[in-house]
């Protein structure tokens, strides 16, 4: 409590110093300089307001985008903390890529509970303000009425995805496993009776060892 009180006092003191310096600066200006200063300040405020409105509109666009992509985070029990932190970094990359995309997708983070949920919220900067749909439920629970539209993207599928369909929702396995679990996401899709497919990356990208490098627009497609 004492530490917080001291921090509050120091913050108030810094605020007073800034206000005093600002007042002194204004008083030292000529009337013409003051008018120009106020004009520039208003322009900055207008620009920031416009940027905030554009960011809000883009956030809304991402939440209502027709194409849905689910990041399945139900694999926390199969990962160590360092792997979950690595997964959190990949989530940040995916989210950043989506916010910069000309046509964003509607992102779902499902199975976001337990240790995976804790690490994600700690490691992902500004997570509470992300324009995503988060749930501790599985994607089958969250999207129970859309099961027929769910397609699990897994590199082990024998089916190649020919095109993206607006009515379908694509699931990507959120796991960093260093190839410990063969066919993990494929087996999961088969057990749940949902469709699965692999991205046609062999036709467009080079392989580096067992790592599949993909462009941000395809988010993350990992061998499991």
Task: Cite the ranges covered by each PLM segment.
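Intrinsically disordered, low-complexity regulatory regions enriched in Ser/Pro/Gly/Thr
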Residues: 61-64, 99-101, 144-146, 162-165, ...
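Eukaryotic short linear interaction motifs
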Residues: 78-80, 115-118, 159-162, 178-181, ...
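RNA substrate-binding interface of SAM-dependent RNA methyltransferases
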Residues: 1-159
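C-terminal folded domains that constitute the principal catalytic or ligand-binding module
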Residues: 167-224
